[in-house]
């Protein structure tokens, strides 16, 4: 490691990654911590789209220097707390909290009318015309202790999901008996989360999908609110509580719960919005119905009050990119012609996200590394043949890949399937003199303004639920045939 007195400035000071394999992320990371794999740790695996809850169980202990995710974070938290107790102590921060979905915040902007407090059109009111302002106490020296225990707010506030608040007093007592209680410190007497198995037990005990008592409790709350019968969806499992030991045997079916909109009562398979359609539970919208018209000011201004077709952004007009279909000589590389095409990055068909994309069998069946699919007509325009090395260049970056020339591709469009990691057969690019990039090297995040709407019914923000997304899968690039004598 070389010490630099004058450190470079950037948006990111330190990048740490915990992973069990080499990826594009680990290549860019300052610190890489080796992680345990599925068969070396205890963990849970399920989603709202799967009818079972599964467990991970170690066949062997984590080898060499690897650790489970929970163990790694516990170790980091312990050392951080030791240092932070002296240097940071207890601090109070003022935090801006967004207006939140499935809360009264969703009615902060009546009729979808947005007034500008900066222009004097309305008062600046926290939680109404601006985010809520919340004071948060941070005891930095107690981070590790708090991480290892179930906090006290579960007793007083319960847990709220999709607008339904669950009372958790009985579950907290159960976890205290199941996991043991913490002795001493700020978490004295609280249920322990010291081990990964303790955390798994807490997750299972605090979810209606794995705890029938909570599922029935949640449906009773919804019944009082909606006036429609719902508890029978979970009553058959009211006495059922799935434990981690249960998941270590055969696959365990989950319980129908108000946390989701589907029904698996009586053994039926999950389908979204079943409860809304069959039991008339209102949708979480302004009208309580499925509807297409959005009367928010911004939607009207954008001409999108009703669903309409929007053509792709004109990158030539917006960012001075060449016009699609344009064929030009690359001045920087002699008279090598380049063709401008629409660049799309569809979801990979040969991997699970980036997992298994580096599988030797899959690489052998394809081109052995990164590739771009293009039409035979576009390839013919610039002298590209199947399996040639090509470079794709735009204002965002450079990609070096093999060409897959196919008549199945439409003229003017290329595909680079996503999650092709930048670590197998990636030569140095002629354009930049640096190693070629990945599928996202040619893209950038473009936030659609209407995604920033908040405080209006179903258009209210919730983390990992509703909010701005990166609309980066619509770009243009210039593709040319590069020298076939590649260097690494």
Task: Describe the function of each predicted region.
Residues 35, 287, 294, 345-347, ...:
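Pocket-edge structural micro-motifs
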Residues 17-19, 35, 346, 374:
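Short His-Asn-centered micro-motif
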Residues 1-27:
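Glycine-rich phosphate-binding loop of nucleotide-binding enzymes
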Residues 71-130, 187, 202-213, 217-233, ...:
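Long, contiguous, secondary-structure-rich segments that constitute the structural scaffold
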Residues 107-359:
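Long, low-complexity segments enriched in small/aliphatic residues
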Residues 24-56:
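Flexible glycine/proline-rich, aromatic-decorated loop/lid segments
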Residues 46, 58-70, 372:
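Hydrophobic alpha-helical scaffolding
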């Amino acid at each position: 490691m070389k010490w630099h007195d004058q450190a470079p400035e950037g948006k990111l000071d330190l990048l740490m990654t915990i992973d069990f394999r080499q990826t594009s992320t680990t290549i860019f990371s300052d610190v890489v911590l080796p992680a345990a794999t599925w068969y070396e740790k205890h963990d849970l695996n399920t989603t709202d789209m799967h009818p079972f809850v599964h467990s991970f169980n170690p066949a062997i202990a984590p080898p060499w220097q690897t650790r489970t995710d929970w163990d790694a974070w516990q170790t980091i938290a312990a050392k951080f707390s030791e240092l932070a107790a002296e240097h940071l102590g207890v601090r109070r921060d003022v935090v801006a909290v967004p207006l939140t979905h499935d809360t009264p915040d969703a009615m902060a902007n009546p009729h979808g009318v947005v007034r500008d407090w900066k222009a004097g059109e309305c008062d600046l009111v926290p939680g109404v015309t601006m985010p809520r302002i919340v004071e948060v106490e941070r005891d930095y020296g107690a981070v590790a202790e708090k991480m290892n225990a179930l906090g006290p707010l579960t007793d007083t506030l319960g847990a709220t999901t999709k607008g339904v608040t669950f009372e958790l007093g009985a579950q907290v007592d159960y976890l205290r008996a199941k996991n043991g209680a913490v002795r001493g410190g700020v978490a004295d007497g609280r249920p322990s989360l010291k081990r990964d198995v303790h955390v798994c037990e807490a997750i299972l005990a605090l979810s209606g999908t794995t705890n029938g008592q909570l599922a029935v409790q949640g449906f009773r709350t919804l019944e009082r609110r909606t006036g429609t019968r719902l508890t029978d969806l979970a009553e058959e499992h009211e006495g059922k509580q799935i434990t981690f030991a249960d998941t270590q045997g055969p696959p365990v079916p989950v319980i129908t719960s108000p946390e989701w909109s589907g029904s698996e009562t009586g053994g039926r398979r999950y389908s979204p919005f079943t409860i809304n359609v069959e039991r008339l539970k209102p949708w979480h919208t302004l009208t309580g119905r499925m509807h297409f018209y959005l009367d928010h000011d911004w939607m009207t201004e954008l001409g999108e009050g009703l669903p309409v077709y929007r053509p792709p952004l004109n990158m030539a007009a917006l960012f001075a990119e060449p016009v699609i279909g344009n064929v030009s000589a690359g001045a920087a590389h002699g008279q090598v012609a380049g063709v401008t095409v629409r660049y799309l990055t569809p979801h990979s068909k040969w991997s699970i996200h980036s997992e298994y994309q580096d599988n030797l069998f899959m690489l052998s069946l394809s081109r052995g590394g990164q590739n771009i699919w293009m039409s035979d007509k576009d390839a013919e325009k610039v002298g590209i043949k199947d399996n040639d090395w090509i470079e794709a260049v735009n204002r965002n970056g450079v990609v070096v890949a093999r060409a897959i020339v196919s008549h199945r591709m439409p003229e003017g469009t290329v595909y680079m399937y996503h999650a092709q990691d930048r670590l197998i057969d990636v030569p140095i690019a002629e354009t930049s003199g640096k190693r070629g990039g990945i599928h996202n090297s040619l893209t950038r995040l473009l936030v659609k303004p209407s995604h920033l709407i908040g405080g209006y019914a179903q258009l209210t923000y919730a983390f990992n639920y509703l909010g701005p997304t990166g609309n980066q899968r619509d770009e243009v690039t210039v593709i040319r045939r590069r020298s076939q004598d590649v260097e690494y």
